[in-house]
Amino acid sequence: MAAVQVRRRGRALALALWAGFALSVGGGVRARDGLATPPAFEGQAAPAVSWPCPPPADRLDDLALLEAIDLALCHSPALRQGWARIKARSAEVGLARAPYYPSVALSAGRSAQRRSTGLGEDGVRNNVMAVTLAWRLFDSGARSAALRAAQAQLDEAAQAYGAVLQDKLAEVVGAYYEAATARQALHTAVEDTEIARRSASIAARRARAGLDSHGDVLHAQAALERARLAQAQAEGAQARALAGLAQVLGVDPATPIVLAPGPLAPQRIEDRELAQWLRDARQRHPAIKAAQAGLAAATAQVDVARATDMPTVDLSLGHYRNSSENVSVFAGSSRSVSASLNLRIPLFDGFARRHRIQGARAEVQRQEALLDQARLATGAAVARAYADLRAARASHEASLRWLKAARAAYESDLRRYEAGVGGVAELLRAQSDWLSARQRHVLYAAQLRTRALALLAAAGELGRSTIDGDPPKE
């Protein structure tokens, strides 16, 4: 009869346990699942440390911009560090969720005792087995506050990862644009050398015909050598730009890199007023979102400090079995089931709780200052990038007008010179002006792309859909 009552009590306790467990898991505070993959880069997950990168290539031919981005992200140590931090924060969310569940432990033991007397020897063997369960039912909100703090820290890590991703994208695209601009500048320098060679050839031919002096030929030859010097400098600039691109991509500096053929397309960007850019940046920039998540985590830590050393209620269940046997005679066994409900009310802790709350509030103030700093820095960066983009647009338009006028003037003076009307000095001045206009136009076209990129990066809007630059497909 007693055994039946024990089993009934055990079933009743089990039912109460599972009912409370369902209420706790179903109605209590629950953390969202930890991130299983890194934050997506507009449909394509960013590479993580566990993802294998492609094997090193002997050379990179026809390297397009988006291919360069993928390669650089795969080899980026900063992104691998950020992703590892996300995984660590995700594990902390799981740790913060763990106190909502009961803990179950199984223990077993065996002991032997032998005794010798004048009447002989006897021995006793004891076998002990126990299953215990401990479950915190009430903790004055400490678990929920800790869970909110862990979730906010995970959000902060994800947003910080996004900020690092923005910086890396800007670095890669900037290096690619620099290499493409250097290639275009070299192409222009080669054409300029051919133009100067043509003028020198015409001057030599006219000198042989007695139409120009030897001094005119020397002036034309000097202009040709100046063009050759500019071509040599452009070749060196291209080599330096490709070396910088290799470093950003994370490949061997000796790897030959050939960019995809064709000119870079202009970087498209929405035409918005500065006030709109600032509003959008405050809402979207990952650095601001990371600071906001850090503030949320600090605020949750204040709740954790308040709930620490507050009243708690714990449920304990235990099922024990003890059996013993004599060396010659079986002694018997016993079973027992225990249940306890414990209330703990801290009375005095040496003012530790008050100091914890003060420290948590100070951290909130620090996070508020960091958030203000992030907003100010983002706003200043957006304002500077916006002004730079406006200036770059004006410079690009002016360089285009200069290029058209200088080319028309050169072609006019060339026709006059070939017709024997103009002199070589006029032709060389027009040629120098046109070549300068060509070089400036290449520079300002590149500057317009980089300034548009800088504005997108400052506003936190850099991504696949906003990055142009690959050559148009035929």
Swiss-Prot record:
One of its GO terms (biological process) is killing of cells of another organism. It is a peripheral membrane protein. CyaE is necessary for transport of calmodulin-sensitive adenylate cyclase-hemolysin (cyclolysin). The keyword Transcription does not apply. It comes from the Bacteria. One of its GO terms (molecular function) is porin activity. It comes from Bordetella pertussis (strain Tohama I / ATCC BAA-589 / NCTC 13251). This is Protein CyaE. GO terms for cellular component: cell outer membrane; efflux pump complex. Pfam families: OEP (PF02321). It is found in: Cell outer membrane. Residues 1-31 form the signal peptide.
